[in-house]
Amino acid sequence: PKLFFEELDFEKYADFTINFPLLFIEHEGAYVSGKKYIFKDFMDGKIREIGNRLPNEKDLTTHLSTIFTENRLKKYIELRSMDACGWECLCSGPAFNTGILYGNLDEAYDLISKWDKNKIINAYLEAPKKGFNTNLMGKDLYHWTSVLLEISKKGLKSRDVIGKGGYNETHYLNHLEKIIDNKLTNADHMI
């Protein structure tokens, strides 16, 4: 949503969520369509189909789970990851984020702190068309991904979590490394 390209704070996020259309409401063990309403209508007791009852915490949690933004605020911060891809790809996204978030955040911050907000937004909007060839701050996304991938890898190595197969989490990044090395995304393979 355009809102997320502006200066966002918690109040704006809360306003966005309560004014977001309801997908459905759970009521007395059944799902009721919420298509005609926004969550604020629910808060104001204006939904006759459910006896004008007010929402509870579970209703809010359900509503938040139907809003598909890049990040969602729940009892934790949920980052949208890669989807519509194979197993290796599905595991790469969370591993990448884990390595960044649990690694050297200062190194990642130093890298991105000088980036221009409008150029980031422009790259975000261009990426669906241009993929990794999208320009950001004078370099393509292949470059930035490879730099961030190295930061992530260092973070996973320092966590040193060993799985059942005896590997640490860095092996989940193999899929992303292959994409960067070959400069071929899943979309490139399909075309």
Language model segments and positions:
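C-terminal accessory/tail domains of diverse enzymes
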Residues: 1-191
